[in-house]
């Protein structure tokens, strides 16, 4: 029974029994405390907690889940998987144990012909909570299960709780006896390898109190309404019903695993190390496909990092098995989409998008590996040469900091060389870097003063009242003066000063908007030029500048005035940022979320999440859409409301940003609506013009758009027009023909480069004749081994091997082994003729001998194969081992 059919039968059975079928929720959890949905009941959690009224009394679903806690264990056993599907039925105060237990039994034991799963009742066991006599009685008297197949367990195994405090209750688990060949008799309490859990029925009837661990907490009392939450793992159920040993042999994971084996020239079940890699690949490719389909994008934080990590683990295991730098993820993703597509048709509909994102990450990681592996290999050699067994924490940090190697990748690679990593030093260096970055960020906010200085001013004078949304100047009272990091009563001409006022029109730098500049004037006595405004602690505005003339004293009444021209220019940039954000989301989809911004006078930059660059058409589309909104002169409106109400209105919030209960919404009449505390124009037409300069990468999965606004944009358009005119004159072509003229020049350049490449390859192949003449005899066989110059491509190595093999003829067995370092990893190619194959030699086996010496693997056809590894110092040894194998055959 296929996995899709198991899911269909489950839903159909419960729908027939009065349950509403609820589609799987996205893997991106609504619950802010969860990174990803990790259990079937997560979408229903608000109903169980009483936060929302359920729209139905009964529900059933097949929920997509990702568990991140044991990703490192995936592949090492056949039980662990990062993605799984949970079949469940739920009751919200409707039925309880008396119905949940018989329903489960009915579905399991009803024949396949009648819509059930056809389990033999004699092979089913159950466990109940130690004191749950009610459940035991239902199993015994209503279902008819013999007493000896009902086992009792304690709180740690058969009592479930949601949170602290929160609903909890006993559970009853149903197990399938796989037979004596899998272990000892005695039921689940004796052997959970033989007795597999297939279904867990949770009876939520109590509320728990504070306490640690699975057992040490009090029961506060019974819930007003009792609920049912059940969970059946689809993958495990599929393994049982399909008659296979484990989930990696089922119709979904098994397909991906078999294709991975084909692509890498390996056979599942022959080598445990290779089997682990194949299981990692199968699981992680499926998980990545499902995450991308639900809108997760590779990144360096939170769920984006989970996706990046599993993608990189699968890519690296693919390369370990294949021994080369081939790109296989596209092929495997296609298999995953097809394997899961019957259950989730959206995978096929979004196939192009899924491929694009995963392919881009594979390419990015290939570049990362290529750049960092040389340093890694050098560090490994240095460690081993000194007799060490621990990979340097400093080297691990450099790999992370310079090449983007996550620590888990370094741990895996080091373990393959029999080394541990000095994680303590690595984490110390990471912490030092974080502290340095934090100090640098705080230095701007704190200036020369200690945080306590600002704390005292806030405590005595209260928070600063911000008037800048409506006023560009105001009267204010000086609450505090700081010079050289110390509070003082006065500041005089020439002093670098920090002023704290009771109220201010000055905007303090925040939300990507630069601070206002201007003047603070003491009537008839002094002037301070304000160059920066910061909020070192929440609520306190600190004006930094220089006393230009006279003096300023605590308790002075001053006149604070901002530079209105600068404010207007910065406000135009900030409003343009909102418009660009909306245009990007309209062009790329909602995954193009804000990752950062900076709004300067006449100029802005906007960072957003995306896995691929914007092409010229997309940039033009964004620019045109923004300027069309400017032409409509949309009024910009502002609203202060609660966070919940703002989100209900559809206002965008920046992920990870901390908001108070009261927030400010900047609304550009349906086109753009965001939470924002910055300053903006009154209507979009005031921006004048927005010119997008281009886009670039600022990190993996994050792109940056830069743009000019207003007069700065107009000046750039004029400059570019003049530049086009100059090019037209130099290339002797009208403006409209410039693209064709430039294309022609580029084509000629590329043709010249190809000719250079052809000549270089020919130079490599010139050695073929001499190599054939240097063949060494081993019995009736001839062998040629040769190391090419570093930088010779793997393709040229294959051509050379085939050329030499052809020159050796077919009159007797001939073996050619060519090795080199195309970039930073060693590669070996073995080509043999038909006579050698008839003599029992196989190119794949010979490559395997060499690749293992290099610390990797490989495969290919019987007549030619390619492999590789990570140890460039072992190339000569690898070639010698190939020759020895031929000599001994």
From Swiss-Prot:
Classification via InterPro entries: aa-tRNA-synth_II/BPL/LPL, Ala-tRNA-lgiase_IIc, Ala-tRNA-ligase_IIc_anticod-bd, Ala-tRNA-synth_IIc_core, Ala-tRNA-synth_IIc_N, Ala-tRNA_ligase, Ala_tRNA_ligase_euk/bac, DHHA1_dom
Keyword vocabulary terms for this entry: Aminoacyl-tRNA synthetase, ATP-binding, Cytoplasm, Ligase, Metal-binding, Nucleotide-binding, Protein biosynthesis, RNA-binding, tRNA-binding, Zinc
GO CC aspect terms: cytosol
Gene3D superfamilies, A to Z: 2.40.30.130, 3.10.310.40, 3.30.54.20, 6.10.250.550, Bira Bifunctional Protein, Domain 2, Threonyl-trna Synthetase, Chain A, domain 2
Molecular functions per Gene Ontology: alanine-tRNA ligase activity; aminoacyl-tRNA deacylase activity; ATP binding; tRNA binding; zinc ion binding
Cofactor(s) required for function per UniProt: Zn(2+)
Any one of the GO BP annotations: alanyl-tRNA aminoacylation
Swiss-Prot/TrEMBL catalytic activity: tRNA(Ala) + L-alanine + ATP = L-alanyl-tRNA(Ala) + AMP + diphosphate
Enzyme Commission number(s) of this protein: 6.1.1.7
Cystine residue pairs: none
Residues involved in Zn(2+) binding: 574, 578, 676, 680
Cofactor binding mode and count: Binds 1 zinc ion per subunit.
SMART domains per UniProt: tRNA_SAD (SM00863)
Annotated compartments: Cytoplasm
UniProt main location, coarse: cytoplasm
Domain remark from Swiss-Prot or TrEMBL: Consists of three domains; the N-terminal catalytic domain, the editing domain and the C-terminal C-Ala domain. The editing domain removes incorrectly charged amino acids, while the C-Ala domain, along with tRNA(Ala), serves as a bridge to cooperatively bring together the editing and aminoacylation centers thus stimulating deacylation of misacylated tRNAs.
Family stated for the protein in its record: Belongs to the class-II aminoacyl-tRNA synthetase family.
Function field: Catalyzes the attachment of alanine to tRNA(Ala) in a two-step reaction: alanine is first activated by ATP to form Ala-AMP and then transferred to the acceptor end of tRNA(Ala). Also edits incorrectly charged Ser-tRNA(Ala) and Gly-tRNA(Ala) via its editing domain.
UniProt xrefs under PANTHER family: ALANINE--TRNA LIGASE, CYTOPLASMIC (PTHR11777:SF9), ALANYL-TRNA SYNTHETASE (PTHR11777)
Protein name according to UniProt: Alanine--tRNA ligase
